[in-house]
């Protein structure tokens, strides 16, 4: 019996050493990959989403994919940047401009056109940067139709000098709907335009059970333009852009124009923006929140308790109450200008 246990312990010891050897080798392999220098991947011709996907599949963490001022069209499959432990896709940049090593100035843009056949981007990796890209004609429908332009479950997404246009999300069943952009985590937008996106829900839900929006994320917006976006619902809340998950959110130097949120038998508010955080040096012009049961407020801006709004201008916005803005419980509003805002109920400029 003693010899049996000695043999058993010897086997266990060998097995444990082998396991540690395999795990150690795997970790070393990952460290070597992570330490490797970043590379450029060039796509040199017009093509399809499959060409962009092939570039992403080749890329490793830290690489830059240059689309080199080309146009790529979709035919039913979205572009995916997978996340997870072994994807090795974190910190990838997808740049629509021409590679500077090939004479690019950094001002060129590439177009990703889904042709209304699919969502454009589905991003699971973290610290992904999209820059100099026109993201257009994305379409997504069904329950929880989130992000016809860009959907991200990864953290720290960056969009720089991008346009998200003509993207449409819709649902006839339960769930939220977001047309241009939806992220579960932090997003940084700079010099971006969100234009002519449409989010609709025809599911006759219990009042305000779900939300229909142009976009939802936490983080910051700087030097952006948000215009001509449309949100419509039956029963669900209809809102423009929502940035409410953190008091550190910031929106600055951004123009919101001609955005429309409407709800039948539900609540419509913040047709341009609903925010928790700081809003500064922004312009809100001709935005409108509408509800057939007089549950509309904040034709332009709805800011949450503890938020600060300063140096902003509100012109020609419309809602039942608080045509320009409403704030809840507490907040600070200073050095702002209000011109020709119209409340069909009360609070032409401000409602609390």
Language model feature labels by segment:
Residues 47-49, 53, 63-92:
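N-terminal extracellular ligand-recognition/capping segment immediately after the signal peptide
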Residues 75, 89-143:
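Right-handed parallel beta-helix/beta-spiral solenoid domain characteristic of secreted/periplasmic
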Residues 68, 129-139, 156-168, 186-200, ...:
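Right-handed parallel beta-helix
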Residues 1-39:
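Secretory targeting signatures
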Residues 30-54, 71:
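Right-handed parallel beta-helix/beta-solenoid
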Residues 76-83, 114-122, 141-151, 168-182, ...:
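Extracellular beta-strand/beta-solenoid scaffold signature
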